[in-house]
Amino acid sequence: MGKKTVFLTGATGNMGWAGFQELYARKERFDIRILARDSRKNRKMLKPYLADPSVTVVWGDLMRYEDVLSGVAGADYVLHVGGMVSPAADYYPEKTLQVNVGSAENVVKAVLAQPDASEIKVVYIGSVAQYGDRNPPHHWGCASEPQVPAKFDMYALSKICAEQVFASAGLKHFVSLRQSGILYPGILGVLNPTAFHVPMGGVLEWATIEDSGRLLAQVCEDWVPESFWNKAYNISSGAQYRMTNYEFMNRMLGTLGLPSPEKVFEPQWFALKNFHGMWYKDADVLEDVLHFRANVPVDEYFASMKSKLPWFYTLASLAPAWAVKLFMKPVAFAEGLGTQWWVENDPERFEAYYGSREAYDAIRSWDDIRPAPLDKWRAE
């Protein structure tokens, strides 16, 4: 049997790059075709692979149908990972809707234009954001849950609409894999106002970047059963990666050698609701089919992320708590997306994320937002 051709969008993003690496490690079975924007960054990333006959780069744009068609033509698998994500999606909501839905339409149109469209297997990467606000006690769910995006979350709306483009197209082989938060070394250095949109009492079931990349390669293997297709699944690295957002923040700060959240953040900086995230009743369904998890213990994984950071991140541990807090404050007060900017300047967002002025004023200490322990091993 000859090699299969895999067309991958979003290959220079976090998940897409991990998927490309996994596919490249299996290049004896796969030819990999990538659609990438013609930028200096992408040219540098892909330069080591340009001479490899197993890799073809289509320099183009997801919003240009002709470019997408060039990638899809002759492909056995189409992995649509590309699109706009946070934080860019938060700053450019209208463009996010246009790009994420428009690119889905281009991919579907290109697949249906092929003479063997019924044989092409199409994978769409959705998002946990599609489920909307699921704070406890409503924090358990599954892929069949209603999709109700959080207010002002244009990214979530774009992912719902894009998934519907695929689901309603009549494709014979289509699957939506809804991605959760991805753990990768760079996340430890991410700091923008959206960090404070996350309620400390909320939850998320994380997926490692390695598991996510392995998943993209596994789905292209011949042994994937026919019964797998035409469904939606949730992606996660398993029960041990279930955390409250407070627990995650503690782990992240601790990994960087920084003090606890109580010492570097004011509790009022964090929203109380209107985000997304849940723990999955069906967490193992996808794993049972694709076997993509490495099952690295979560503490070991955070330690490995730290070991991969540039050396200067170690300097963070030298900063006293008061200095870290002083550094964080402008982020919470940033114009536009800062939660504390909303207090006086954006009553609609303030109400959506806090509920009311009374609820906001009632946050007097960390005791008011610190969540009680939750049983992460048994769905309620």
Residue ranges and their predicted role:
Residues 185, 190-193, 203-240:
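Alpha-helical substrate-binding/gating segment
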Residues 160-186, 227:
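Conserved beta-loop-beta element that borders a ligand/cofactor-binding pocket
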Residues 49-102:
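NAD(P)H-binding glycine-rich loop region in Rossmannoid oxidoreductase-like domains
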Residues 4-26:
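N-terminal Rossmann NAD(P)H-binding glycine-rich loop of SDR-like oxidoreductase domains
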